[in-house]
Amino acid sequence: MRGYGEEGFTLIEGMIATVLLATGLLGLASMQTIAMGRNGDANEKTRVTNFAVEIIERIQFNRRNALAYNGIDTSVVCTINTTTQPMARGDCDQWRNLLTGQLATGLQNLRGQVVVTTVGPTLPPLNQNRVVVTMSWMGDAGEQKLATARSLSITAMVAPE
C-alpha cells in the first residue's frame, strides 16, 4: 500500500504506458509500409505517363500526318507503310522499342495503344485531331501480393500549324 506522499509508477501504469507506446510504434510502421507502396505506384505512373507523352510529342511534331498514327498497338508489329509514311513508321518502331526496352524494366506486360480521330465538322474547318494514348501494364504489388492490372489514358488535341 502507498503511504501518504509516495509517488511513482505502479506496475499497471507501466504496462499501460508500454501498450500505448507499442500501439503507436506499430501504427508508425504501418504508415511507413503504406507510404513505400504508394511511392512505388507513383513511380510506375510517372514512368508510364512519360512513355505516353513521348508518342504524343512525336505526333505533334508530325501533325500533318497525325492520322497515320491511328491504330498503333505496341503488342503487335507496326503496320504503317514505310514508303508513304516513313516518319510515322519510324516513330512507331522507336516507341515500340522504347516500351519493350531497358527503360521499361519493372513494368510487366507494358502495352501502348494510339487512337487518332478527326474532330469536326466545325465551321470554319479546324482540321484538328484528337489523340488518345492508352497504356496498360501489370503493376508491382510487392512481394506478398499478386500483380494488378493497371491502365492510364491521356488525351491530346493536335491542331495544324
What are the language-model segments listed below?
Residues 2-5, 9-53:
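Aliphatic-rich helix starts adjacent to a transmembrane/signal segment
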Residues 37-161:
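Flexible, low-complexity segments enriched in proline/glycine/serine and punctuated by aromatic residues
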